[in-house]
């Protein structure tokens, strides 16, 4: 990837220091949060200061390394930790605590389970050596996600151009799957970036993505920063835009891809896939292999996170249409929906797109995997590097 292309940094890391871009404040303010404790990272994940399945997982891994270094200094001074096993126990308990922060995105649990396994089996017999193991593991996860982004970008852009058989393509997407959702460039939006860098992007159409408006606040923000041609549309306009604007492909990200290809992603993705099937527009899912979940047979086994009703019934009084939950007191909230004893609000964060609607294929760092013409459409457990 050429260094000439500068992308936003949602994660700022150097050894011992981790800062996360508070994405609730974008695009009006650019504020980084210091992560100095496990409570800090859990809060950042739960409150969606950091979001996007890959970014959540990487942030958790880096937070573990940063907090471990700080804790080692403090515990040594207080003579609380006396052996390497004392430190290991702290790290394992921290992983368990972070794992519960967001249940639907599989990247977080996969990364933390692997970290726990590596920490448990590490033979280091000093606290300093345990720390070095933790730091090396976290930095390896960080670097791997950047590499995954780059490879997904290249594979996806090349495939879409070949499929469309034209010089410049129109892409439709939902939510935010760019640099703000990953370690560097993005997955679905990374593919759009690559098309733009190569001069092959005609236009991007971005769904606003209610109720947190990740498309309007974040995807459009990334596009404006890099002068990527983009049109923002209401979520309810997806069928109309496919009918009237010559969309060549729909490309979305994922928070979990089950063994059969069923995909959990931002609420509204299922609607998008249904509309794409009707209009015969190829529908692609772009995600790193860390998002693949071969242990969950299908979408029925995915726990769908639900969030507070106020995300739908209230807007931030600070302006800009920012959505905020009760913890986001920096902006204040104003109710814009009538209240009553019989009013209920259903606010699932994700929906499940059946594998049968992923008509284009699944794009990972290993390549593009179209649906099979016979047998199961997808078998995630067999998606391995060629």
Swiss-Prot record:
It is found in: Cytoplasm; Nucleus. The record marks 175 as: Transition state stabilizer. The keyword Hydrolase does not apply. One of its GO terms (molecular function) is translation initiation factor activity. Its main location: cytoplasm. Pathway: Amino-acid biosynthesis; L-methionine biosynthesis via salvage pathway; L-methionine from S-methyl-5-thio-alpha-D-ribose 1-phosphate: step 1/6. GO terms for biological process: L-methionine salvage from methylthioadenosine; translational initiation. Keywords: Amino-acid biosynthesis, Cytoplasm, Isomerase, Methionine biosynthesis, Nucleus. It catalyses: 5-(methylsulfanyl)-alpha-D-ribose 1-phosphate = 5-(methylsulfanyl)-D-ribulose 1-phosphate. Pfam families: IF-2B. The keyword Cytoplasm applies. InterPro entries: IF-2B-related, IF-M1Pi, IF_2B-like_C, Initiation_fac_2B_a/b/d, M1Pi_N, NagB/RpiA_transferase-like. Catalyzes the interconversion of methylthioribose-1-phosphate (MTR-1-P) into methylthioribulose-1-phosphate (MTRu-1-P). Belongs to the eIF-2B alpha/beta/delta subunits family. MtnA subfamily. This is Methylthioribose-1-phosphate isomerase. It comes from Trypanosoma brucei brucei (strain 927/4 GUTat10.1).
């Amino acid at each position: 990837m050429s260094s000439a292309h500068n992308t936003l940094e949602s994660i700022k890391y150097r050894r011992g220091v981790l800062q996360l871009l508070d994405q609730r404040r974008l695009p009006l303010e650019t504020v980084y949060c210091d992560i100095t404790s496990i409570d800090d990272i859990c809060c950042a994940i739960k409150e969606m200061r950091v979001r996007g399945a890959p970014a959540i997982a990487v942030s958790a891994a880096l937070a573990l390394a940063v907090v471990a270094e700080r804790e080692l200094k403090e515990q040594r001074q207080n003579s609380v930790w006396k052996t390497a096993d004392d430190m290991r126990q702290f790290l394992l308990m921290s992983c368990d605590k972070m794992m519960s922060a967001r249940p639907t995105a599989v990247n977080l649990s996969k990364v933390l389970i692997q970290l726990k396994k590596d920490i448990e089996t590490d033979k280091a017999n000093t606290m300093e050596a345990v720390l070095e193991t933790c730091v090396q593991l976290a930095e390896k996860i960080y670097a791997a996600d950047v590499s995954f982004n780059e490879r997904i970008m290249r594979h996806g852009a090349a495939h879409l151009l070949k499929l469309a058989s034209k010089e410049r393509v129109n892409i439709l997407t939902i939510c935010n799957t760019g640099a703000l959702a990953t370690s560097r460039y993005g997955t679905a939006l990374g593919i759009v970036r690559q098309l733009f860098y190569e001069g092959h992007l005609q236009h991007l159409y971005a769904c606003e993505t209610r109720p947190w408006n990740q498309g309007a606040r974040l995807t459009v923000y990334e596009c404006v920063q890099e002068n990527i041609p983009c049109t923002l549309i209401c979520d309810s306009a997806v069928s109309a835009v496919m009918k009237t604007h010559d969309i060549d492909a729909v490309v979305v990200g994922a928070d979990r891809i089950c063994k059969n290809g069923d995909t959990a992603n931002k609420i509204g993705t299922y609607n998008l896939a249904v509309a794409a099937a009707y209009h015969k527009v190829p529908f692609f899912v772009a995600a790193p292999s860390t998002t693949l979940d071969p242990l969950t047979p299908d979408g029925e086994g995915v726990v769908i996170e639900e969030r507070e009703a106020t995300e739908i019934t209230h807007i931030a009084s600070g302006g800009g249409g920012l959505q905020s939950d009760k913890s986001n007191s920096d902006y204040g909230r104003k109710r814009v929906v009538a209240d009553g004893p019989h009013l209920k609000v259903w606010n699932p964060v994700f929906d499940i797109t059946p594998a049968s609607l992923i008509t284009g294929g699944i794009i990972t760092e290993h390549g593009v995997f179209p649906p099979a013409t016979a047998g199961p459409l997808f078998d995630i457990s067999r998606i391995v590097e060629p």
